[in-house]
Amino acid sequence: MISLSGLLTLLGIPIRALILAVKFYTVGLPYRKYSNSLKQCLRLLVFRTAVSLSVFDAYYISFMSNDFVINKIVPLFHKSITSKLPGYGTRYDKNSFWLVKQPNREPDDPILIYIHGGGYFLQTQPDQMESVLSMYKLIKPDKQARLSILLLDYKLASYGYPFPTQMNQLHETYLNLVTNEGNTNIILMGDSAGGNLSLGYLQFLKKTQLENLVYPSKLVLISPWVKLQPALDVMVPGNSYYDNSERDMIAYSQFGDPKKVVHITGEGDLDSLQVCPGARPTQVENWNDIPTLKDPRFDVFVITGEDESFRDSILDWCQYALDVPLNTQYKYGNSNNQFDKEGYEYIRKNDPGLCHLRLYIEPWGIHDSCLFFENHLILKIKKQESDPKKSSLDVNHIDDKEFYGITRIVQFLNDTL
């Protein structure tokens, strides 16, 4: 049964929404990125509320299975898109669904495994699906024709499946693709907890040392949750947790409680890089011997937000694992929503011993904004496709400020697939 505090939290949403609306039209809100959009501010309120629930209370708002979301909810609103995707909604194995299953796949054709966020205790949301499908629709036709996409249907901690259940499920699907089928071009794309699982899986592969091991050829990390429990000393001015506590979807109080983290990780060791990629103390050599990160033939994309609580921990991880020193060279928080390549973009190509890298800090961006707050791009795509006189939308014609994350991920995939 849902706890009293959880019930009161959910029942209080309408009251908090009313207060938010009054503030929006009077004194203003701390959500800088969406200060001119009441709709987005209300959505942010709902997302903050969901993440604030205990792991067990989250069970009562995670009642929709991925099967239901993929095959009922998304087609209900976007049938014109899903009906044209080959293999959409069919199972690959017990742990995954195809979003796109290209016919006549070759072993070197790319297969992207999308690993959804939600703290390991919240289910995939239609918003995330809309953004992922928007990315696919904007990829160049010749690249699109070869790209297949899987959704990892991992079990939730709120249903009694703590970590490493999710790691084991990913490994089972990965082995099916690589060992049993011989696929050689696997991409991992994860947001938040999905980013955590993607990075932890690299450490898992490193430790297992399987024969003829195939590492992911590409990694797309969207606001990866690299440090599961914030340190006690982060709530000081100048730290992203403190500065963005009122701006972001994520707040210190949501994961500062050790009990909540234990309910997610089970008996997992928070000092293990498989569980907590941002565990400290860490060393550069912890991330050596992982081709995905250390070989220029591999590609990595990372995005975080200036107004994101996880920002500092993500940039700390980038320093140790990717040799990117932005966290020590720049101070964030004063971009005035203007993109400046210096400090907010880091691109590296063809450096010996290092992967091809694109790292972005979105001005005023918040946690997971490209999947939860850019999903309305799918409506523009549908409108364009409904007019037979118009050609398909090109990513270069999309507003790259409104759709900051999606446009850059698509450009990355267009250039690297």
Residue ranges and their predicted role:
Residues 97, 150, 358-362:
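General small-molecule cofactor/ligand-binding pocket signal
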Residues 111-113, 150, 301:
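Conserved beta-strand elements of the Class I
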Residues 131, 145-185:
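Catalytic nucleophile-loop/oxyanion-hole region of alpha/beta-hydrolase
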